UniProtKB/Swiss-Prot annotation:
Binds to sialic acid-containing receptors on the cell surface, bringing about the attachment of the virus particle to the cell. This attachment induces virion internalization either through clathrin-dependent endocytosis or through clathrin- and caveolin-independent pathway. Plays a major role in the determination of host range restriction and virulence. Class I viral fusion protein. Responsible for penetration of the virus into the cell cytoplasm by mediating the fusion of the membrane of the endocytosed virus particle with the endosomal membrane. Major glycoprotein, comprises over 80% of the envelope proteins present in virus particle. The extent of infection into host organism is determined by HA. Influenza viruses bud from the apical surface of polarized epithelial cells (e.g. bronchial epithelial cells) into lumen of lungs and are therefore usually pneumotropic. The reason is that HA is cleaved by tryptase clara which is restricted to lungs. However, HAs of H5 and H7 pantropic avian viruses subtypes can be cleaved by furin and subtilisin-type enzymes, allowing the virus to grow in other organs than lungs. Coiled coil: none annotated. One of its GO terms (cellular component) is host cell plasma membrane. Palmitoylated. The keyword Transport does not apply. The gene is HA. A lipid is attached at C539, C546, C549 (S-palmitoyl cysteine). The record marks R329, G330 as: Cleavage. HAMAP family: INFV_HEMA. This is Hemagglutinin. It is a single-pass type I membrane protein. Disulfide bonds join C14-C466, C52-C277, C64-C76, C97-C139, C281-C305, C473-C477.
């Protein structure tokens, strides 16, 4: 189908943009559903199912908890002096020594996990007048009775248990972590059999702190053949400070100290397989890529990870507004520029030209405007990732039953943070999408205005993204318009002449329509006059009588 007004002396040039048959729906600030030619998913919703051991050093706890490894449970001796970035605790971990409790378990676990090491230094504590290295059949080390390797169970020597008063200064330039404990016998008889005194006492102090523990004698549920318990405590001694231990019984003494380090190490509960692979981000479900700014896999993370959000999907537009082409038009059909719809099949650019002239029809992309849009869009994903991904980890939180209110508050804070990030993510993506669409629309308008300024009075804006060129414009001429070298002065006289001729024809065609309407109106008027005259004549002759009743 030829374009209106197109012959050898004129041409038509349309500007358009890329379109696809089925676009992607995204959200903007002004519209919840707008179709674009291309978009990328911003939310990571799945993990690899395995924990990668690179670049982070992963220590598999296997059947040991971190605290059991710290104390020196016989079946955890393999972890002595180990280091890690992430300690992975398994659900099948168990204790296999004398039953114990840690009143401040969560704090100790977190402290040791963040230190990233079980490096232990033995010190020469002097325990005079007592028996050292006590053991239990609940804590077998091989065939013999044993005990936690990092602790020293002190009992009576003969029939005496003297008051112990031991000091240990910290002359180093780092913090030292001392682990110690108090034994709670199950009966009074067991108390006197082990420590002579009917009631013991343990006091551990530094210049900054002091703890005094009185044993609670009484039977408890049997665990590994024992109804007694050991309570584990810990003390940090700063450089220049002194550790003082005073006791008259029931002391589970330290054998030395753990060297504390500061760092980004952590701990995570997971049953995911540890494999040889590379991933910066780890969750209990397994490692996940961090090439997206958001994730919906797990709230608990370690490493450089996407932010956790509630949404399962957030689409970032990386293409322009999509207006699918009407397929019934052919190449030009009834002339469709960018104002009416987009063009499919533009594989070499986002913006371009279609023309029809004496040499036929053609299409070409405008690489300059395409590149301008792409350059501004390409960095969007990286910029969003930079705003959201950080070198941080979200650790698990544990609280004892008596800290229930603190746990509720912590959960509320975490849920609020997730709500805020989910909202921020929604707004951030909507803003970026709005900017992308406005940007691509702007580049189309810039190209159209640039073409209009070149053609000037040599062409007429047809109102739909096309120009009618009023001079002969072969393919070389069309190319000069596309590349910006068109000289309108060269074609001005020809264009003016052709414009007057074409407008004149259109004007004459318009006069015919006016004449027809005027003739029709005059004919109707004359018919009415004749009819009225006949009625008046008939009334005068008496052939027609007209009665008017009031």
């Amino acid at each position: 189908q030829d374009l209106p007004g197109t012959d050898n002396s004129t041409a038509t040039l349309c500007l358009g943009h890329h379109a696809v048959p089925n676009g992607t729906i995204v959200k903007t600030i002004t519209d919840d559903q707008i179709e674009v030619t291309n978009a990328t998913e911003l939310v990571q919703t799945s993990s690899t199912g395995k924990i990668c051991n690179n670049p982070h050093r992963i220590l598999d706890g296997r059947d040991c908890t971190l605290i059991d490894a710290l104390l020196g449970d016989p079946h955890c001796d393999v972890f002595q002096d180990e280091t890690w970035d992430l300690f992975v605790e398994r659900s099948n971990a168990f204790s296999n020594c004398y039953p114990y409790d840690v009143p401040d378990y969560a704090s100790l676990r977190s402290l040791v996990a963040s230190s990233g090491t079980l490096e232990f230094i033995t010190e020469g504590f002097t325990w005079t007048g007592v028996t050292q290295n006590g053991g239990s059949n609940a804590c077998k080390r091989g065939p013999a009775n044993g005990f936690f390797s990092r602790l020293n169970w002190l009992t009576k020597s003969g029939s005496t248990y003297p008051v112990l008063n031991v000091t240990m200064p910290n002359n180093d330039n780092f913090d030292k972590l001392y682990i110690w404990g108090v034994h709670h016998p199950s009966t009074n008889q067991e108390q006197t059999n082990l420590y002579v005194q009917a009631s013991g006492r343990v006091t551990v102090s530094t210049r900054r702190s002091q703890q005094t523990i009185i044993p609670n004698i009484g039977s408890r549920p049997w665990v590994r053949g024992q109804s007694g318990r050991i309570s584990i405590y810990w003390t940090i001694v700063k450089p220049g400070d002194v550790l003082v231990i005073n006791s008259n019984g029931n002391l589970i003494a330290p054998r030395g100290y753990f060297k504390m380090r500061t760092g980004k190490s952590s701990i995570m509960r997971s049953d995911a397989l540890i494999d040889t692979c590379v991933s910066e981000c780890i969750t209990p479900n397994g490692s996940i890529p961090n090439d997206k700014p958001f994730q919906n896999v797990n709230k608990i993370t370690y490493g450089a990870c996407p932010k956790y959000v509630k949404q399962n999907t957030l689409k970032l537009a990386i293409g322009m507004r999509n207006v699918p082409e009407k397929q019934t038009r052919g190449l030009f059909g009834a002339i469709a520029g960018f104002i009416e719809n987009g063009w499919e099949g533009m594989i070499d650019g986002w913006y371009g030209f279609r023309h029809q002239n004496s040499e036929g029809t053609g299409q070409a992309a405008d690489l300059k405007s395409t590149q301008a849009a792409i350059d501004q869009i390409n960095g969007k994903l990286n910029r969003v990732i930079e705003k959201t991904n950080g070198k941080f980890h979200q650790i698990e939180k544990e609280f004892s039953e008596v800290e229930g209110r603190i746990q509720d508050l912590e959960k509320y804070v975490e849920d609020t943070k997730i709500d805020l990030w989910s909202y921020n993510a929604d707004v951030l993506v909507a803003l970026e999408n709005q900017h992308t669409i406005d940007l691509t629309d702007s580049e189309m308008n810039k190209l159209f205005e640039k073409t209009r300024r070149q053609l000037r009075e040599n062409a007429e804006d047809m109102g739909n993204g096309c120009f009618k060129i009023y001079h002969k414009c072969d393919n070389t001429c069309i190319e000069s318009i596309r590349n910006g070298t068109y000289d309108h002065d060269v074609y001005r006289d020809e264009a003016l002449n052709n414009r007057f001729q074409i407008k004149g024809v259109e004007l004459k065609s318009g006069y015919k329509d006016w004449i027809l309407w005027i003739s029709f109106a005059i004919s109707c008027f004359l018919l009415c006059v004749v009819l009225l005259g006949f009625i008046m004549w008939a009334c005068q002759r008496g052939n027609i009588r007209c009665n008017i009743c009031i």
